[in-house]
């Protein structure tokens, strides 16, 4: 049996394998892949349970939003946010924290746009995140005291997630994700 990849051993291992053998190892890995080894820690299970509870509540919100036909364009964006959140949870469960954070960041951008476009459809073409958050400060859905608090919480979460995207060394976690592959 060939050992799993490690960063140190990758070059020597690659020298002994050809691409077909390597693909067979990857195919075997995919065939036998199981998430069960990721759910053995009770503390992690509680975190996943909390994440799922929030995700489920959001999915109920999106379903009701769509049912009421408030805004078809917003429906599409909120569906995309649902997808972003589910993918983020799936990545987090597997220990892939960076892609999980990146998906959350995408979800935040799409959520803010989905809400703003109810009254300001042209926000859909805006690519500047700064402009999107500025538009949120002026949007009636975020104009209430509660709405403004929510917008601020979302903005703070987005800022924290940006640390991962922009390579802040204080949030880097050298994971051995490659060691999970054949």
Model feature map: region roles:
Residues 103-105, 121-130:
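"Short basic amphipathic alpha-helical interaction patches in structured regions
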Residues 53-87, 91:
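Short, contiguous, well-structured surface segments enriched in hydrophobic/aromatic residues
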Residues 94-97, 121-124, 143-145:
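Inter-helical turn/loop segments and adjacent helix faces that build the functional surface
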Residues 90-93, 112-120, 159-174:
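Charged/polar positions within long, soluble alpha-helices
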Residues 78-119:
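Short, hydrophobic, well-ordered secondary-structure elements
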Residues 63-70, 113-122:
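Short low-complexity stretches enriched in small and charged residues
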Residues 1-66, 126-182:
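Long, charged low-complexity segments
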